[in-house]
Each structure stands twice: as structure tokens, then as C-alpha cells.
Amino acid sequence: GPDIGGPVGPYVQSERMGMFKQYAEQLVAEGKAYYCFCTEERLEALHAEQRANGEMTHYDGCCRDLPEEEVRQRLAAGEPYVIRQKIPKEGVTGFDDVVYGHIEVENSEMDDQILIKTDGMPTYNFANVVDDHLMGITHVIRGSEYLSSTPKYNLLYQAFGWKIPTYIHCPPVMKDAQNKLSKRNGDASYQDLVAKGYLSEAVMNYICLLGWSPKGEYAEQEIFSLEELIKIWSPDGISKSPAIFDPLKLRAINAEYIRRLSPEEFQKKAEPWIDQAVHTPIDKKLLCANLQPRCEVLGEIPEQLDFFDAMPDYDVSLYTNKKQKTTPETAREALEALLPLLSDESLDFSDRDTVFNACKAKAEELGKKNGWLLYPLGIALSGKQRTPGGGTDLACMMGRETTLARVKAAIEKLNG
């Protein structure tokens, strides 16, 4: 590759430019290509006339059969030129594709494509064929939009007497029914998705399922390790129809990958995102234990944690919850009942279960359900309805000092 070199370098296109013209001139010498001296003005006029007549624009072969002497004179005079491939005028050119099968095109429908431009640079198609041959490429895997140009590729391989590679044309990935995914239009790339907090393995898994489906015993399976994909992937499963990129499906697969991480793996991946939002001491292990079952995309973690560093302003109407049978009035009562319990130095905040059981016992003592007591605690500690964990979880993440300060502030707010 370009970074480490190798036996078929150079691997940077600009460093290979000198080799293409000699291959084009070889085809000219063998009568399989020719010099074309047509000016831009002539070609523009030709195409305008063809369009006016309702024809597809194409080169008319004006320079295809120029006498050799005239060609030599014009070259000697320094006249600008391109080198064009001499496409047969009759017959058909066919090729076999692993996905689309055997395809044939009438030679009369193909243009004498340019191989070398006036500046001496090769065209994309010509450079591709020469590079692939010299680098020993055996399989050409590319988008189905290149199906139409493949016959010209094959004619070049045949002209040189080179072995034709195996073609695998893949359907495009669409943004919707009409538009292809395009970086130019702001659609996310692999790197963008990883930067947003999608797991690399999940993105790879999802992308593999775009336009491809497993067979046999794996037909209903959606989650695959890289090792499994390497083992079972086959071009037989590639669809001819375009695939539509479904961000919700990617999200679901990513969430499943997150759930399958060990607690230690999840914390390692989540910590950089946690550190973006939280700069005060918290129990990260407990936080991650609560985040992991709820997390779908790592990049969405910071917005869930914005209350740890500073308590946001909130409306006391948040304490109203029909399911938990709470109101601002009952919330004040609940928090006042919790305050002595949470102030007890013997209560170990490093043990979440101990704190929860103590709160549960207090609820039973009051003749109330757990939610009646703990829902207000969660609001008092976060100022939010949705948080990564319940009231006792948040208390243990924050520690006794912060918990007591926020509970006291909440009681004061409710009294105000």
C-alpha cells in the first residue's frame, strides 16, 4: 500500500503517470487505438448537432482512419491530440458478472473512448485497467453504475491479451428511493459514524447487511462477529436491487453490540464521552452499569449527564407523576422523610443495594410504594424526568455530600 510500499508499487496514482502513455501507444502501433486531433470546438459542434437530431452524443470517428503519413506530420507539427480506443463497429462484447450474470452490449452502441487526454494524463477507465493488470488484481468489486463501462474494460484487456478479472458489481446504497448516499450531500461516512459514537464492529455488521443477505442456517441472523462474516460471506448473497440505508436499523444493531459488551469494555468505551460532560467526582462504575442497558449510541451519553456538574433550573411541576402518585406537595413530604435517612453516617453510599433497601424500608414504614419516595429523589438530584438510573442510583453516583445539598435545595424550592 501507499504507506508501506510493496512488490507492485508505486501505489500513489500520481507516481504512476509516466507508464500509461506507453501502453496506449502500444495499442496505436497494433491498430487498436488511434490519435485524434479533433478540437474542442469541433466536438462541441458535433454534439450540438447530434442533440438537435435527437441522437445520443458520440464521437463520429473522424480521425479513426487517418493516413499514417498525415498522422506523423500532425504529430511532428505539435498538434494537440488525444488517444482513443478503436472499438469494433460490429458484433457484440459480453462479460460475466457474479451478481448480474452474463451481459452483452452491441459494439455499435459504444463510443471510441479516450485513453490519453491532451495533457498526457490517462482517463480513469484506462488507468484502472492498466493498474489492475500490473498489480495482479483478480477480482474487481465496484458499484453497479460501472456495468455499462465494463465492455470497454474487457475490450482493453483483450487488446492487450491480458486475463480478464472476475467482476462483482454491487448495487448502490440509497439514502431513500430516489437518492444515493453521498458524502457530498452531507451523508455520514464510516468515520463520521464512529466519531458520533457508533461502534466500529456494529457499523461493519450493518454495512455488510446492506445489499447482502446470509443463506441457510444464518438466514434469520442479524448480529455477526467479524470472524463469522469472514466465514459465511459469499457473493451469492448480494442483491441486484439497491439497498436503502436505515439509520434506525443501524441504531438498533449498535445498541445490541453495546449490550453485549462486558461491563469493563463498556466503561472503557464510555469514559471518554462521560468525561466530556462530568468533571466532578462520581461513581463511574455505577453510572456505566445504569447507562449500558439504556445506551444506543455512545455519542448521546454527554447530553444525559449535564446535571452532574451543576443542578439545572427546573419547574416543580416535574414532581407530578400520575403513575407514582406524586405531586409537589407529596414530593416535599417524601424528601423531608428521606433527609434524616440519607444524613445517617452509617448509611454506606458506596453500596447501592444498601441505600436502596434503606429507602425501601422507609417507604414501607410510611405505608407508601417505592416510587412515591424515590421518584421525587431522582427529580431533586437531577432536575430531569429521564436520567441514567433511579433516585438511589443517582445518590450513590454523586455521594452523600452532593445528595444532601441537592435534597435540601429541593425542599427549599418546594417550600418557596
Ranges and model annotations:
Residues 1-7:
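A glycine-rich helix N-cap at a beta->alpha junction
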Residues 28, 32-35, 47-50, 54, ...:
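A generic secondary-structure signal for well-formed alpha-helical elements
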Residues 353-415:
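Charged substrate- and nucleic-acid-binding regions of tRNA-handling and nucleotidyl-transfer enzymes
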Residues 10-14, 37, 116-117, 135-146, ...:
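Conserved phosphate-binding loops in nucleotide/dinucleotide-binding enzymes
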Residues 263-366:
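Small-residue-rich helix-loop
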